[in-house]
Amino acid sequence: IGRIVINPDNHNELVVGVTGHLYTKNEERGIYKTSDGGATWEQTLYINDSTGIIDLAFVPGNFNIMYAAAWEKDRKAWNFKGNGNGSGIYKSIDGGTNWTKISGTDSGFPAGENAGRIGLAVYDENTLYAVLDNQFRRSKKEIDPEKSDGLTKDMFKSMTVDTFLKLDNKELNQYLKRNG
């Protein structure tokens, strides 16, 4: 279970984010909803057999508007992959009965094969905060030492101890500010 939210105005209405089995794929994951205090449950969001819901949050004062964080993961005893195309953010405007994916390539939020675990916090109807365990690799930038303003990481790789000890403190501090 990733998260359970209870309607503050109706304690019989609950929405549950289910992450799924830890080491195997299964279809019993996604979002489940009950309106009768748990006597019956309906799966209202299913993405795939390796993507579950790790977080749920609703707008304070408006249980109808809620957000869900989907997390695709594949855990084995010998390996863990915590990212995938299934990871993303979904929105419901009817208390968790229907869901629409709001994250994607055009949303401005990182999406795709390297999107990882997402945490959510809702401030109001217009403000959603999301934190992403981003598995996207940054492209390596080549720095020309002759055009550089100062020290570079590659300079340290080939630097002798004596050269390092003779570095100007101002130049070293500038490097640390740029890269620290």
Regions found by a protein language model. Give the residues of each.
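Beta-propeller blade termini and top-face loops
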Residues: 1-180
